């Protein structure tokens, strides 16, 4: 578990990339985007399925991202940076290079700023549903950035990736994919967009995120309104992450979890931080009106139940890190069932065990 006490430290602006690089990104864009309204069939193809359930309001989430671009301008978020840096650390464990990288939504600026030459990236393509977020990232400048990386930007949707199959070497998504209505479908599209032996890296918020706020909200609603109203969005559980990677068809899947505890002076500071990250509620079936008495009760319950000795209140963020590779002949393959030439009984006898 990691503890982060300070937020919003100032940083320099990001390096502006020439507009001409945007045109070169079209080499990787398909004329028709993949469709997420489908399922992964046994033949390895993405198949149509009209029964997709919509949980999140994607238009509202785009508005949240637009607002976050304005709120987070010229500011450094310690939590967002820690997650992005931890995710990118996995590139240091890879011996190969990834010339073409595709970054999906989430903390675009942090990923770009913290790459620091990792992964041998030569071309970086950055996509977000929010035009304002893309513009903010593109227009920023930072002398610490690697100018040798050719960077392009465009607006797109994680649910309909406008990328050609087998066109990129690396896909990175830091704190972005958990807002998709069809997470398995989005991951399948990511897998198809990768070249053979391409790498998928993602960090999403897990189900234990904001558990303190969930408890406080539930108790406040029961006390003031006599029932429960969904105020926080549902998130994937750790046990689901491995199944998601396997269902998407990734080989050598890997999942690990980290918890970050961020401290705030008051409950309103937590809400402001969530807005600055674009992480506020986007449920389709949400109560759009928050009773003032319920809000005050939530803050009071939060403080009484979870306040620490130093007067701050903690908020837990559970981050699930996922890695997966597109299949390649160089990857280890499981042996066919029944192909073993030595039995466990023989091994036990050989090493002096008792039967």
Swiss-Prot record:
InterPro entries named in the record: Malonyl-ACP_OMT, Methyltransf_11, SAM-dependent_MTases_sf
Alphabetical GO biological process terms: biosynthetic process; methylation
Keywords from the UniProt entry: Methyltransferase, Mitochondrion, Transferase, Transit peptide
Keyword Transit peptide recorded: yes
Residue range of the transit peptide in the UniProt record, numbered on this chain: 1-34
Its EC number(s): 2.1.1.-
Enzyme class, first EC level, given as a word: transferase
GO molecular function terms attached to this record: S-adenosylmethionine-dependent methyltransferase activity
Superkingdom: Eukaryota
Gene3D superfamilies registered for this protein in UniProt: Vaccinia Virus protein VP39 (3.40.50.150)
GO CC aspect terms: mitochondrion
Subcellular location: Mitochondrion
Family, similarity comment: Belongs to the methyltransferase superfamily.
PANTHER family in alphabetical order: ARGININE-HYDROXYLASE NDUFAF5, MITOCHONDRIAL (PTHR13090:SF1)
Protein's name in the database: Putative methyltransferase At1g22800, mitochondrial
């Amino acid at each position: 578990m990691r503890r982060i006490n300070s937020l919003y430290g100032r940083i320099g602006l990001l390096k502006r990339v020439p507009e001409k690089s945007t045109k070169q990104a079209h080499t990787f864009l398909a004329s028709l985007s993949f469709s997420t309204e489908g399922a992964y069939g046994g033949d390895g193809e993405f198949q149509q399925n009209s029964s997709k359930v919509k949980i999140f309001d994607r238009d509202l989430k785009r508005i949240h991202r637009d607002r976050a671009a304005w709120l987070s301008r010229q500011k450094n978020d310690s939590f967002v940076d820690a997650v992005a840096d931890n995710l990118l650390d996995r590139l240091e464990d890879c011996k190969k290079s990834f010339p073409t990288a595709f970054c999906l939504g989430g903390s675009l600026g942090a990923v770009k700023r913290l790459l620091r030459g990792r992964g041998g990236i030569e071309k970086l393509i950055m996509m977000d549903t929010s035009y304002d977020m893309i513009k903010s990232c593109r227009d920023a400048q930072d002398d610490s950035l690697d100018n040798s990386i050719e960077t392009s930007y465009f607006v797109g949707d994680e649910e309909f990736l406008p990328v050609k199959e087998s066109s990129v070497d690396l896909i990175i998504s830091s704190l972005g994919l958990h807002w998709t209505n069809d997470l398995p479908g989005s991951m399948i599209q990511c897998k198809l967009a990768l070249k053979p032996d391409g790498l998928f890296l993602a960090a999403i918020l897990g189900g234990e995120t904001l558990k303190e706020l969930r408890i406080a909200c539930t108790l406040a609603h029961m006390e003031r309104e006599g029932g429960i109203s969904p105020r926080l969005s549902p998130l994937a559980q750790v046990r689901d992450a491995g199944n998601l990677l396997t269902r998407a068809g990734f080989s050598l899947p890997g999942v690990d979890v980290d918890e970050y505890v961020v401290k705030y002076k008051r409950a309103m500071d937590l809400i402001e931080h969530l807005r600055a990250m674009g992480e506020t509620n986007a449920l389709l079936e949400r109560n759009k009106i928050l009773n003032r008495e319920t809000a005050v009760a939530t803050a009071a319950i939060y403080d009484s139940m979870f306040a620490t000795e130093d007067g701050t209140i903690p908020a837990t963020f559970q981050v699930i890190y996922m890695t997966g590779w597109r299949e390649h002949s160089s990857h280890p393959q499981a042996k066919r069932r029944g192909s073993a030439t030595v039995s466990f009984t023989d091994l036990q006898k050989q090493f002096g065990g008792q039967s």
